[in-house]
């Protein structure tokens, strides 16, 4: 049964018995929640904040993320490419995002600040006003990507082949 939550704060105790899949959350705060391997299939998050949450390996199949902020979260092994692009609006601050995939995504107006993106996949992405401020890209894959709208200010460990990717001239 689909539930709607508005302007609510969730801690781990409130999450333990809640079925997340298929619900809608608007203007909600998830603080210190352990949600690893949870299915968010067909879930809608609008103007929500995840702070110090463990979201490793969550399933985002047909999950809408509009105005969602992730602060100091663990987001390892997530496939963001399963989120519909028309509802995609996210920001990441000081997150661990190892083995995360953005394959083929349109990353428009998305801001990554001080994130650890080791071994993540950015193949086939299109970046429009995408900021990667202070991020670590150790062993990340960039292949057939349009990076002309990407800002890699203060980013480290990225290796981008200009013959396989579109970059600013």
Language-model features, listed with the residues they occupy:
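Tandem repeat scaffolds
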Residues: 1-169
């Amino acid at each position: 049964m689909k539930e709607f939550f508005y302007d609510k704060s969730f801690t781990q105790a409130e999450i333990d018995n809640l079925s997340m899949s298929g619900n809608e959350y608007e203007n909600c705060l998830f603080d210190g929640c352990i949600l690893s391997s949870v299915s968010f299939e067909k879930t809608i998050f609008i103007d929500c904040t995840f702070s110090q949450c463990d979201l490793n390996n969550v399933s985002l199949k047909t999950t809408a993320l509009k105005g969602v902020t992730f602060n100091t979260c663990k987001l390892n092994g997530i496939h963001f490419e399963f989120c519909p692009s028309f509802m995609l609006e996210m920001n990441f601050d000081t997150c661990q995002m190892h083995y995360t995939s953005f394959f083929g995504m349109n990353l428009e107006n998305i801001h990554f600040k001080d994130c650890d993106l080791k071994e993540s996949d950015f193949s086939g992405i299109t970046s429009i006003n995408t900021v990667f401020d202070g991020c670590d890209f150790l062993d990340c894959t960039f292949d057939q990507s349009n990076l002309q709208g990407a800002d890699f200010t203060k980013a480290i460990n990225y290796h981008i082949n200009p013959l396989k990717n579109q970059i600013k001239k």
